């Protein structure tokens, strides 16, 4: 059974879906005003892996992740780029899709956009006003934080603790509020800013209301899982709970999941645009195979921080190559496999035992770090089996299926390089013939040519194998 660490309770809990074998999951998506950096990509990759594991375990996942296409940062970017806010959003939604596709992140079941939900947002706010949870002042609408009795339950903060911080804020907005703790649901329009008509005058929605509206519209009033980065726990997710539960009277999400940061530098600073210590995915995938970056990001337990450095990335690349070599060794032996061998049942039983161990590790709050350790064990077993003089098709097929299935959970695959492979095979065949003809000069020439292309040859009793160098 799958256990999830629930931020709400600070405990691991057995996952019990609202509807049997189905998962309703909402994850906060990007604010689309720039290219995403690898810290942003952590969330997309973490929840893609979680989604894939649910599917591996037989669940049907309805996965909704939004695009925030209305925001102060987008308005600022529009002014700097001298284009409209919708044009900024469209440009960077496309960039996000290209970057995540390169990282083999599956598109969500639905990617709703704020601009497409204005009538829903207005209706949601009106209900909160009618219930006394919100009020209008000077064209702005604010949420009455103290009216929601359980405010602070997600971040485990009391109203008194929050009040100390809020009382130190200044500005016109603070003067308009009934209480420093109140937060904006609707912001009145400023000159030359994108805006929409509302019962309170022209304006645009606050950040927190958007996710409450889109989650409850597309996944019902109560959802199984709400996820996002740790930095969203407060105030964003806390405010989502207050808004949603005040409107519906029901629990908003049963499980709250938060992924860890990507850190960088000797002080392990959180990677962020505000600190200027970030590397965009767009830049990174020009230098590094996106699959290696995906591997680097996928194989740490999602709640743990990932320390980015040249050395940790190189280590990931080396481990990825070891898995690829094991896969290529296995595929190499398929051509000469026999129909069956007496020891087949022994190997198939070992594979079944490995699969159960993998499931046990991943069922424990999607512990990818422990899960990938089992993948390494399978790779070692594959290498040892491939070295045998005689191998059987049933064992090769079972190993291939298990290995490929596990890699898919982590969003990994080995690129189809059939044309290149065919060229390599042709050169190896020519080299073999040259050796038979005792034309060692040509044999060495072919070996050197392949080496220059990153192809390493290994002459074995079963024939010449090749692999791409690390």
Swiss-Prot record:
InterPro entries: Cys-tRNA-ligase (IPR015803), Cys-tRNA-synt_Ia_DALR (IPR015273), Cys-tRNA/MSH_ligase (IPR024909), CysS_C (IPR056411), Rossmann-like_a/b/a_fold (IPR014729), tRNA-synt_1_cat_dom (IPR032678), tRNAsynth_Ia_anticodon-bd (IPR009080). A motif ('HIGH' region) lies at residues 30-40. GO terms for molecular function: ATP binding; cysteine-tRNA ligase activity; zinc ion binding. It is found in: Cytoplasm. It is an enzyme of class 6 (ligase). A motif ('KMSKS' region) lies at residues 270-274. ATP binds at residue 273. Belongs to the class-I aminoacyl-tRNA synthetase family. PANTHER family: CYSTEINE--TRNA LIGASE, CYTOPLASMIC (PTHR10890:SF3), CYSTEINYL-TRNA SYNTHETASE (PTHR10890). This is Cysteine--tRNA ligase. The gene is cysS.
